[in-house]
């Protein structure tokens, strides 16, 4: 098992690869045979397919991410990030508003043998997001 700092470095590397479009580099961060995403209810192949589909049909654009915290304890790494995007398509029944919205999101990864083997994520402040879309409330 890696140290908490090594585990955080692995998650940072995965996110950097994903953000830069380096799919092979991102995939190398996972144990493809053992990985399971609780958020996607899928193995690694299923998770990638769901992510591609969501990107194609994404009702938000011009997204930016601000990492507020990256914490490791044992084999778990937790990231708290603020996502800001422009609402450009229908989401939760709310037509595109053109508003800039921001919500906090949590991601949790479990690391084993220097690879990501489990993920819980996309834990978003949905009530806050809906309020921003529906009424234009913002931070």
Feature locations, PLM:
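A solvent-exposed, acidic/Ser-Thr-rich amphipathic alpha-helical stretch
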Residues: 23-77, 81-85
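C-terminal-biased regions
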Residues: 60-64, 111, 116
């Amino acid at each position: 098992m890696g140290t908490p700092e090594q585990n955080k470095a692995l998650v940072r590397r995965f996110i950097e690869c994903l953000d830069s479009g380096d799919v092979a580099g991102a995939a190398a961060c996972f144990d493809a045979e053992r990985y399971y995403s609780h958020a996607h209810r899928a193995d690694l192949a299923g998770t990638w397919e769901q992510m591609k589909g969501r990107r194609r049909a994404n009702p938000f654009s011009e997204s930016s991410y601000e990492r507020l915290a990256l914490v490791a304890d044992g084999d778990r790494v937790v990231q708290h990030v603020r996502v800001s995007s422009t609402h450009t398509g229908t989401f939760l029944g709310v037509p595109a508003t053109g508003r800039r919205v921001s919500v906090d999101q949590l991601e949790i990864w479990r690391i084993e043998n220097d690879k990501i083997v489990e993920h819980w994520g996309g834990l978003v402040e949905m009530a806050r997001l809906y309020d921003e879309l529906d009424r234009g409330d913002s931070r």
